[in-house]
């Protein structure tokens, strides 16, 4: 059991609070959903089959934290996570992505996740193998050779000269190994052999092939043998190039794929954004009919079905689906009834207030102000935000959201980037300490805020 699996829903919310301000209802809903997954794993096989995830529908304007809540939750739980827009899909039979492709993408993410974990486990062993390959390039290993006549009678007589050569070779290698580990040889150039694909033609993936879980480029690539090429490079670069190659040799890909399939099926999270854009009102025609078609294609996946992928069949019964949308024009009730029923948990996220902007700039562990401070610290520039400076940034951002289109917390990015533009450009050729107070913010934004046309383009 991982450390995350021991967390209670309350503790999961506390973890999310470190990165996301407010939205306690949404945090509570996702924490319960994830905890129920952990509870399900402890049940007997008979009960496991009966209990499926309760999918969530998040309703709220852009920039209030819908995606971030789902993304952070996936990171905390170590779950494969895929964010997609519902609008990228088309009904089966039309040109465009079919809804099945989301499952294939999730599995691909899971395979890469497990592969990275396995590669990390064998990293030390792989580093030793890389070391040997580099030493082979510097001083080819000499083998002990036996006298042919002695071989006939099973005798192990060695030529004295060859024994001396072998010992000298070993001594040289050990000396170079010491220098290699200390980094003395990093700038030396060596020639190494690297395997490359020998496929004579480049292939573009066809949607038809993707739909049946086939990757044509992989099929063709497996037909043609891999070609070995010799490349010259510095030892420092060779270490980076050879490490993933040696790591891959040490991991069992069949086991990796099997683990990844289990992970995707039982712990996968798919975040479907812009769900409101595929909602269609009753009696509509044309484009709205196509939207309904996407909903009907989505239904069996959310209900639970088996999708064929290039790694094997994947059951979607236990994947957690989190859908989100602003629902300004349409309503959740405009979705087809069957799909509505598959998202039983509905959470409304609150629009951000001015005080929320203040908290967003200060409280999260990855707060924007802290990000800029860290960036400029690399140039020996100390950036300090005063309380009135933070409040002014929040006030301006909130006001712009009211005046222009409401893009939520994303407004802080544009405002802060504009305020710090000169500092970021001139660093490190400026004074070592920059204080961002209310006057500083006003001075940097004055001309833009006063000109409404300019505001709409720049902020």
UniProtKB/Swiss-Prot annotation:
It is found in: Cytoplasm. The keyword Methyltransferase does not apply. ATP binds at residues 21, 63-68, 273, 338, 410. GO terms for biological process: protein unfolding; proteolysis involved in protein catabolic process. The keyword Metal-binding does not apply. One of its GO terms (molecular function) is peptidase activity. InterPro entries: AAA+_ATPase, ATP-dep_Clp_protease_ClpX, ATPase_AAA_core, Clp_ATPase_C, HslU, P-loop_NTPase. Signal peptide: none annotated. Transmembrane segments: none annotated. GO terms for cellular component: HslUV protease complex. Its main location: cytoplasm. Keywords: ATP-binding, Chaperone, Cytoplasm, Nucleotide-binding, Stress response. It comes from the Bacteria. HAMAP family: HslU. A double ring-shaped homohexamer of HslV is capped on each side by a ring-shaped HslU homohexamer. The assembly of the HslU/HslV complex is dependent on binding of ATP. ATPase subunit of a proteasome-like degradation complex; this subunit has chaperone activity. The binding of ATP and its subsequent hydrolysis by HslU are essential for unfolding of protein substrates subsequently hydrolyzed by HslV. HslU recognizes the N-terminal part of its protein substrates and unfolds these before they are guided to HslV for hydrolysis. This is ATP-dependent protease ATPase subunit HslU. It comes from Thermosipho africanus (strain TCF52B). The gene is hslU.
């Amino acid at each position: 059991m991982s450390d995350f699996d021991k967390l209670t829903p309350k503790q999961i919310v506390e973890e999310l609070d470190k990165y996301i301000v407010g939205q306690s209802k949404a945090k509570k809903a996702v924490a319960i959903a994830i905890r129920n997954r952990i509870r399900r794993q402890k049940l007997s096989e008979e009960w496991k089959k009966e209990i499926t995830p309760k999918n969530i529908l998040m309703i709220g304007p852009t920039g209030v934290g819908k995606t971030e809540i789902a993304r952070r939750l996936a990171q905390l739980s170590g779950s494969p996570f895929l964010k997609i827009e519902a609008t990228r899909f088309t009904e089966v039979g039309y040109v465009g992505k079919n809804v099945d492709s989301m499952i294939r993408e999730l599995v691909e993410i899971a395979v890469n996740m497990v592969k990275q974990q396995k590669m990390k486990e064998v990293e030390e062993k792989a580093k030793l193998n890389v070391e040997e390959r580099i030493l082979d390039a510097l001083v080819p290993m000499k083998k002990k050779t036996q006298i042919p006549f002695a071989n006939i009678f099973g005798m192990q007589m060695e030529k004295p000269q060859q024994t001396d050569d072998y010992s000298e070779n070993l001594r040289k290698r050990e000396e170079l190994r010491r220098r290699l580990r200390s980094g003395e040889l990093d700038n030396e150039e060596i020639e190494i052999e690297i395997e490359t694909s020998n496929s004579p033609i480049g292939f573009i993936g066809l949607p038809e092939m993707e739909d049946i879980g086939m990757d044509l480029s992989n099929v063709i690539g497996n037909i043609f043998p891999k070609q070995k090429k010799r490349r010259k490079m510095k030892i420092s670069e060779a270490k980076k190039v050879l490490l993933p190659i040696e790591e891959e040799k040490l991991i069992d890909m069949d086991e990796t794929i099997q683990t990844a399939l289990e992970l995707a099926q039982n712990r996968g999270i798919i975040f479907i954004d812009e769900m409101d854009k595929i909602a269609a009102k009753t009696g509509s025609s044309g484009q709205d009919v196509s939207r309904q078609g996407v909903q009907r294609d989505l239904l069996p996946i959310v209900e639970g079905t088996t999708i064929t992928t290039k790694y094997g069949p994947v059951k979607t019964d236990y994947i957690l689906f989190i859908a989100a949308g602003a629902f300004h024009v349409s309503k959740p009730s405009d979705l087809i009834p069957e799909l509505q029923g598959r998202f039983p948990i509905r959470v409304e996220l609150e629009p951000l207030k001015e005080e929320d902007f203040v908290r967003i700039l200060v409280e999260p562990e990855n707060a924007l102000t802290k990000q800029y401070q860290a960036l400029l610290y690399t140039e020996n520039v100390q950036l300090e935000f005063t309380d009135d400076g933070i409040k002014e940034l929040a006030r301006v951002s909130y006001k712009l959201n009211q005046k222009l289109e409401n893009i939520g917390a994303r407004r802080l990015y544009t405002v802060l980037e504009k305020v710090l533009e000169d500092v970021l450009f001139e660093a490190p050729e400026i004074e070592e300490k920059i204080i961002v107070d209310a006057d500083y913010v006003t001075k940097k934004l004055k001309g833009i805020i006063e000109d409404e046309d300019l505001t709409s383009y720049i902020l």
